[in-house]
UniProtKB/Swiss-Prot annotation:
Catalyzes the isomerization between 2-isopropylmalate and 3-isopropylmalate, via the formation of 2-isopropylmaleate. The lineage of its organism: Archaea, Methanobacteriati, Methanobacteriota, Thermococci, Thermococcales. Pathway: Amino-acid biosynthesis; L-leucine biosynthesis; L-leucine from 3-methyl-2-oxobutanoate: step 2/4. GO terms for biological process: L-leucine biosynthetic process. It catalyses: (2R,3S)-3-isopropylmalate = (2S)-2-isopropylmalate. It holds the Pfam family Aconitase_C. HAMAP family: LeuD_type2. This is 3-isopropylmalate dehydratase small subunit 1. GO terms for molecular function: 3-isopropylmalate dehydratase activity. Belongs to the LeuD family. LeuD type 2 subfamily. It comes from Pyrococcus furiosus (strain ATCC 43587 / DSM 3638 / JCM 8422 / Vc1). Keywords: Amino-acid biosynthesis, Branched-chain amino acid biosynthesis, Leucine biosynthesis, Lyase. Its EC number is 4.2.1.33.
Length: 164
């Protein structure tokens, strides 16, 4: 499984209230959530980004409240992956559970800039910065995590397993 898109780089401690402001938590409709992803941090993000683009962030991405709305909004907006130096553990689990690929890759975060064209091979953990001609590495997902992501999340994965 691969992803390719432009990078959108943000800093450390991007919390779930910044990813999807609390005033929109009265809905769980992914399309509506996507309209407001990162709007308090980068009001133009939803207009500038294209499907497949990649969020790059610093330490502790997804900290704060435990809400599935945050990774759901990111995925619904068309973001293909998030690369960060580190993730809040609850965000990490929620992202996998809804099928949003996320990678911890501190070196990549240091080198990637907004606008760089990035390609990720999730099976190897290889991150290519096509703009700079550089290659970075992250730990690839274990096979069972890849199965969950490919299925579109834990619920879809479980449905498929139960249908067998």
């Amino acid at each position: 499984m691969k992803a390719r898109g432009r990078a959108w780089k943000y800093g450390d401690n991007i919390d779930t209230d910044v990813i999807i402001p609390a005033r929109y938590l009265n809905t769980s409709d992914p399309k509506e959530l996507a309209q407001h992803v990162l709007e308090d941090l980068d009001p133009e993000f939803r207009y500038k980004m294209k499907p497949g683009d990649i969020i790059v962030a610093g330490e502790n991405f997804g900290c704060g409240s435990s809400r599935e709305h945050a990774p759901l909004a990111i995925k619904a907006a068309g973001v293909s992956a998030v690369i960060a130096k580190s993730f809040a553990r609850i965000f990490y689990r929620n992202a996998i559970n809804i099928g949003l690929p996320i990678l911890e890759a501190p070196e990549a975060v240091e080198r990637i800039e907004t606008g760089d064209e990035i390609e990720i091979d999730f099976s190897t953990g290889e991150i290519r910065n096509l703009t700079k001609g550089e290659v970075y590495h992250a730990n690839p997902f274990p096979e069972f995590i890849m199965e969950i992501i490919k299925a579109g999340g834990l619920v879809e994965w479980a449905k498929r397993r139960l249908a067998k």
